[in-house]
């Protein structure tokens, strides 16, 4: 999908679901990584993540466009355009737009992080940490015993 196709799609969705024209620019932003799209308050433009179109197709892209158009139209009307505002939530429900977009497949893989488990050699108390701990510097907070890395640190 080209930029011109995207612009026409956003204009069509705006007229179809909101009965109002979209008079600004919609573009794909390759720098977006964790969000489906964003509405720029200063310029009134909408930026969308092309990875969502490639991963889930046009249906998911239209859902993201509807969400961003809710921000757009409410902001131009001077109403509550933020996620926490009741005007925004009501309009989302009215046009059946999602509040959040689905996570991309590669995002789900990135969340599985290593967990380090340290065990006290005296009282056997377990400590779970995301980062490695210098066992020469730190001791058990309960009894002062030496900490040992358990099972190579993975769970």
Curated annotation (Swiss-Prot):
Active site, renumbered: 68
Keyword Iron appears in the UniProt entry: no
GO CC annotation: cytoplasm
SMART domains: SprT
An example molecular function term from Gene Ontology annotations: zinc ion binding
Domain SprT-like: 6-148
Listed name of the protein: Protein SprT-like
Native source species: Geobacillus sp. (strain WCH70)
Organism classification: Bacteria, Bacillati, Bacillota, Bacilli, Bacillales
């Amino acid at each position: 999908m080209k930029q011109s196709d995207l612009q026409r799609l956003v204009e069509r969705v705006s007229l179809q679901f909101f009965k109002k024209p979209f008079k600004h620019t919609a573009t794909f932003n390759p720098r977006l990584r964790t969000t489906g799209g964003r509405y720029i308050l200063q310029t009134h433009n909408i930026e969308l993540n092309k990875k969502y179109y490639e991963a889930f197709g046009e249906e998911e892209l239209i859902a993201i466009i509807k969400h961003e158009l809710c921000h757009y139209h409410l902001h131009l009307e001077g109403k509550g355009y933020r996620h926490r505002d009741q005007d925004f939530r009501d309009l989302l429900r009215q046009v059946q737009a999602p509040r959040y977009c689905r996570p991309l497949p590669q995002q789900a893989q990135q969340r599985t992080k290593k967990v380090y488990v340290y065990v006290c050699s005296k009282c056997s108390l377990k400590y779970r940490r995301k980062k490695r701990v210098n066992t020469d510097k730190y001791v058990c907070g309960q009894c002062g015993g030496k900490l040992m890395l358990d099972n190579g640190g993975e769970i």
